[in-house]
């Protein structure tokens, strides 16, 4: 034995350790993969040895290889062996490897439970610490459930080192096993007051992370956190607590008022920028939520803005960005506080970082007023000229237009200035937003009538400029502006000073290089301009001038007829024929101007974006009907379609001759020159530039005219926007002087009347009058259509039915018939118990349709009251029709003689003889002074393993209940379906509010793994109760009971299928007997059908066979027999456990009879 140990020690001396492995990998760069595979083979041999030190060394090397990306899952069992070593140095290696490689899918992870429990209870704090650290990396739901109590015990350990680790790992345990949160929370709360600052920081971290998703659940800790915030000096802890308060403030308004003072003190005193930013951010959130409740908070806002200015002026780009981000939040509620720092925001436009420049641009959008609009745009225009890169320049262009056009041009006082800005923007080369500038030009010219004359003069200058035509090849380029220019000059041609000159500019040959859609607008507006000139010439008696304009049109329009664009061709051809006809009439001295101008009479106003939706569909028009009959499926797709006009000719591919090489081209050129020289009839050209082109090789001998595409710095005739800025300043100065004069006169009158005022009103944006009387044209809508009609909403919007005024008390006609629906129907006759069977098997969509129909009925009722039209008859007719259809359905289901003979068999339904007392499937869930909760659990065959829980919430208080949220602790067997992205400990919001005395229903889906046993889930309803005195946060705990009967669905079954099912021999059997039953057999069967979701297959005297089916497809068959004072139930089911539990539930129900 001693020799064996010595031999093992000698072998270990020659084993490779981690350093040797790393060194070897460095030395084998060329064949690294091969070397590592050899090392893995060696490691596998080492793991087979009994010596724990060799195994630990092997696992250490495997950990390094795992970091390089190699799979070591095959060594999971060996890692557990090293974890269980008694020596700490080996144990640490094992836990490190486990934390690197173990995950929920690791098969052997269940073997670690006892080892980890042993290490957690170890007297050595290092063994316990390494176990906690490793467990935090590979904790699974099973490990969390099994070890939760052990970790909770460690939260009270004597060593702060262990307490801190135990507190931190509890967060991972909560995530994997949410049921542990409630029992562990008291201890976690105690750790907030732990004497050790590390443990305290860990507790703050865990609770703040939990509260980040569900802040309302932690409102009760607000006093404790407030105490910590005012006493702690740890900046990291303060940041966490302040972030938590920022989330809690919207839920509890009273908390915000208390926070202002300590947060303000921290802002004044702290030098840490991170803490300063969080304080400012939270103060902003508090002031936004309390904007109506705190009348005097301007000092706090000013303090925040001043501190944010310090952040923005800092050289650190991250702090500068955060400062701008927080400033944008203040801007939404307190714009005037931010506007005073306009100079700083404009300086950020010069920053090297593009993200900071873009953030500053977003701020400028909200800082605009009538006073500073021109100044801000002027600054942005200078940045447009200096901007590097098309992306940022295009962003600047977009922002300039957004700033000026916001709120329907609210801040523009001089539209001539805005038109000049748009014209200056047309000089940008390479922009992709030409269509945006064009849209603005069109919009301003159409909406603002007073500016049309000036706009036309500027557009005519644009049409005459060469630089726009030069950029016609770029898609969405600046040439798009010509689209707007041509339309404006054509539509408002009466304002043109030189219409003939503009007409010639629009008919230039170079216009044909523009994109097709711009050429089409040119052609259409050329004829408008022609009609205007024609009218002017005829009124002046210049017949020759009118004929000359017509001749110009006839000469220039053919170039558009030859266009490759189909629309340009069509428009040009049509207009050319019209002009030729006019030319013939002019030759006969017939006046034609009036008729031509009548073609374009009237104004084209802008159409509202939603106008098309408002157009009513004519009666008799079915937009969903087929125009042509659809092709039958039998027709083969590969059938060749017949030619519509003539038989198609067989097209043969044209063989193009291969291109000649350079020698062949030179030989042909020389031969051609020789032939031309010897030809006496060939006219030789004189020496000219054309000669040079003929001497050039290839096809370049064709003469090409050199075009000067240089762009002038300033387009002639275009006014600069700076001139309008000066004119606007002078106009405002004169306006101010006139106001001062009027104010002095008023003051003198007041002195005479012995009246005094403490202060003079300051000039505001509203005092600045616009330069022109602006008449903004509104968008056109169809007759009797309003912009705010409810038709604007998407009819397929799933949230449309929830758009209800919840604060308004419910009228009698609007109350939901949730509980009344079943009570009234069941109280009339036992016949209503049968439709309950149908209701269980219906899809949830039916409820939505009913709700939508009720909404439509309400709208119709309102219209009926307004128009006083006799619509109630129609509604009554509809109800009678529904009742008739219901009656037909019942008659189909029930044989006509079923009620007469009690001894005859009754199939597929509940027996119907005696009247039953009213019953409801809704059971009480929980109640307090604020709310009452009742629920009904419904299964569906369409959704396997899922049940729908319908919860009715009734407000029993005088407060408005809002912000309601349902939290249910999932079990291993039942899980609540939550919205996508939510975790298991997140609550599900209730999609409505409850005014006093109102009830409503919410539905939730649960997924059930095994339905053979009943189970209970704990849940909490949290809500805010708001009344005149304020708002309080309340909660109501409940237990959701899933009985086995709730997993059954009433399913009809015929006697033949029922008999085959019993004969199959696949069903387990069980039975019960209940004594002391005096209820009639009819009522007894109705109770079983109603409460346990069975249907009657066949009944003979006091014996009946019944059937039901579970959501997972289990068949349940019953034979119910009634004696004099007892009832026996024999059952068969495909699952014996499910059957025994069902019979126990049935026994409890029958015992109450």
From Swiss-Prot:
Biased composition (Basic residues): 741-758, 840-853, 863-879
Gene Ontology terms: cellular component: AP-3 adaptor complex; axon cytoplasm; early endosome; endosome membrane; glutamatergic synapse; Golgi apparatus; Golgi membrane; lysosomal membrane
Compartments, as annotated in UniProt: Cytoplasm; Golgi apparatus membrane
InterPro entries, alphabetized: AP3_complex_dsu (IPR017105), AP3D_dom_metazoa (IPR010474), ARM-like (IPR011989), ARM-type_fold (IPR016024), Clathrin/coatomer_adapt-like_N (IPR002553)
Positions of modified residues (Phosphothreonine): 762
Annotated Basic and acidic residues bias: 639-675, 726-740, 795-839
Tissue-wise expression: Present in all adult tissues examined with the highest levels in skeletal muscle, heart, pancreas and testis.
Coiled coil start-end: 659-679, 725-756, 845-869
Keyword Oxidoreductase among record annotations: no
Modified positions (N-acetylalanine) in chain numbering: 2
Family from the record: Belongs to the adaptor complexes large subunit family.
Stored PANTHER family: AP-3 COMPLEX SUBUNIT DELTA-1, DELTA ADAPTIN-RELATED
Function: Part of the AP-3 complex, an adaptor-related complex which is not clathrin-associated. The complex is associated with the Golgi region as well as more peripheral structures. It facilitates the budding of vesicles from the Golgi membrane and may be directly involved in trafficking to lysosomes. Involved in process of CD8+ T-cell and NK cell degranulation. In concert with the BLOC-1 complex, AP-3 is required to target cargos into vesicles assembled at cell bodies for delivery into neurites and nerve terminals.
Protein name from the UniProt record: AP-3 complex subunit delta-1
Species this protein is from: Homo sapiens (Human)
Gene that encodes it: AP3D1
